[in-house]
Amino acid sequence: IGVATQLAVLAATDIEHGPIECLFTVDEETGLTGAFALQEGFMDGDILINLDSEDEGELFIGCAGGANTTAEFTYQPIEAPQDYFFFSVAIKGLSGGHSGDDINKNRANANKLLNRFLSQLNAKYDFYLCKIDGGNLHNAIPREATALCAVPMKDKEPVRIDMNIYTAEIENEFSVTEPNLRTELSSESACATAIDRDTVDKLLKSVYAVHNGVYAWSQDMEGLVETSSNLASIKMVDGKIKIVTSQRSSILSSRKDMSEMIRSAFELGGATVTTGDGYPGWKPNPSSPILKVAIESYQRLFGVEPKVKAIHAGLECGLFLEKYPSLDMFSTGPTLRGVHSPDERMLIPTVDKFWRHLLDILIHVPVK
């Protein structure tokens, strides 16, 4: 919608505005690579209106910075007893959502729920873990996770009973935020190999120990998450188990501290851990001149004052500001819901208000 809006402005011949540039970036959702590649001197303007927000009537003036911390466990394949009961365990139907915007909503993390049950099985039975897979995008709360396991045939029914008990427990814990949560336990064909026992123990304990969710709330803006971490994905690739986590914070030192906590838990489990360079946050400027123009415009058009907020998610604005420190900017957009999930959608009536507001701002931006 941001791209379409810019193209509409460029194509129109009846829109009043001063000198204007439109900046298009690629891969915002997967790594901010377009914004990272922006060079100093590429743009001439000193006012930027970011069109990437998700709530009409709310103007954003700050965001969190973030970085990914990745752990890799190297395992040895061992022979799986062919006379054991092989079964898959799955966590499904979770709400998911954006790991910044939705991290404060107490939604379940499929990787954590699966690991919790596998840890119970590992402690109680002669347990083999053959495969594990959960989550996908680093910036999404995982909705599904699965594992292929094996226990002695005599423990087939006890495992099913344990699953029923565990399902009732987590359904009770997440009765409000995860109404569609479901678990599945299905018989499977035998798997030739499994992950060695030592790695399984260390993997399950490390994932159990790693923090997931809100860690600290902002002391400056009520209701704003300051620091968080998301256990985004668990994948088996080329003889290794790769776990991607994502840390966010509006305070750089707190984000680094959170990343070190994650690193410590995984390194204690014997994993190799790396933390990426990350991306910067955007410190709010309530005295922004363009923000004043936007607020007055909204009041003039709709008779109410827009909400001015900061967001616990990564916007490209932090990177723009790093390259252009004098930029005066805010972020806006129509209302979107279910972002970063299969349920992603846009509330169409909000597009008209968003469009009218943008055009009025363009009219009233002071021309130097």
Regions found by a protein language model. Give the residues of each.
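His/Asp/Glu-rich mid-to-C-terminal helical/loop segments that flank catalytic regions of hydrolases
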Residues: 40-41, 107-124, 152-156, 201-208, ...
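Redox- and metal-dependent alpha/beta enzyme cores, enriched for Fe-S-associated oxidoreductases
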Residues: 253-272, 281
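Acidic/histidine-rich catalytic neighborhood of metal-dependent amide-processing enzymes
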Residues: 1-82, 130, 215-218, 222, ...
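A short beta-alpha structural unit
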Residues: 147-148, 182-193, 230-234, 242-252, ...
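Alpha-helical metal-binding/catalytic segments enriched in His/Glu/Asp
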Residues: 1-29, 87-91, 98, 105-121, ...
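Acidic-enriched catalytic cores of C-N bond-cleaving enzymes acting on peptides and small amides
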Residues: 6, 62, 79-84, 103-133, ...
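Active-site-adjacent substrate-binding region
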Residues: 102, 109-111, 116-132, 284-327
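Zn-dependent metallopeptidase/amidohydrolase metal-coordination segment
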Residues: 219, 226-239, 302-361
